[in-house]
Every structure is written in C-alpha cells, then in structure tokens.
Amino acid sequence: MTNSRMKGKNGELDACRALEKLFPFKWERTAQRYGKGKADIEAQCDWKIHVEVKRRKTGYSYVYGRLKSDNLIVSGSLLICRLSKLRTVMDDGVCLPNVAPRCAGLEDAILQARTDARVGWLPIVLARQDDEEWLLAWREEVDTRLMEEVRTWLDGNTKPI
C-alpha cells in the first residue's frame, strides 16, 4: 500500500473513532467493503449523510486559528466547526458566525462529497491537519436539515442496520 493510501486509511479509521465518541453507534470505512462510489466512512445505522474524509499535513492552519476564538465560522458557502464543538454549536443556536476567507481545500472536498453522494444524502466533510483535531464542514444551505439529523443521532433515535 502506498504511503498516501495508508495515510488515507489511517485518517478514515481515526475519523471513525472520533465520531464514535460523539454518536452512539459504530462507524466503518466503506472502502474495505465497497470501493468507489460510497462515502469514505458510514455509520452503522439508518442515516443519509455522505462523509468525505480529508487528512492533510498542512493547509487548514488559518481555519484552526479562527476556531480558537469562535465555535463556528463561515468560509465561502461552508460552515465549519471543530467536531468536538458540534454539540456546543447546536445548543448555543449560533446564528451569525464570523466570516473567514474561503478555504479552497475544504471547498474542493465538499464538492467531491456532493458529486459522490447518493441522491437525497447530505454531503459533509471531516478534515484534519496533522497534530490538530477534526474539523466538520458542511454547506450553509443544508444546515437546518443536517442539524435536525444530528440531533436525532445524539438523542439515540436511529435504527441500526
């Protein structure tokens, strides 16, 4: 396995572990079972979210810097928060997050997620820079629907598959 493929695999496994700390169900890499055309990782429940995982050595430093003082930022058409702050963002009802310059890497990743997602599925991106925690990015236009879905998962109202 090449170094970049191993890094991708390790990033996906790490993302699964991070999501399992937040949500009450198991996560798995899909590449092991399905290959292309599916999300990088999927929850083992009835959810309709397409998760694209990106792990980079650098490239998100500005976003991490902005998220030191804010729980949620807007970057272009994306909303971005630290995965560990998702509950805070939902509970605080943050309405007007601070605007940050566009993050091309995250915009490209969400475009890939939108292209690969099945019809009716919400595309999101989990991204992490080395030595940092996971970022969660989603399009502003799906914010309400995503938050409703996430609240359902956090309440444990999902069906295992």
Give short role names for the model-derived ranges.
Residues 1-161:
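Catalytic phosphate/metal-binding cores of nucleic-acid and nucleotide-processing enzymes, i.e., regions
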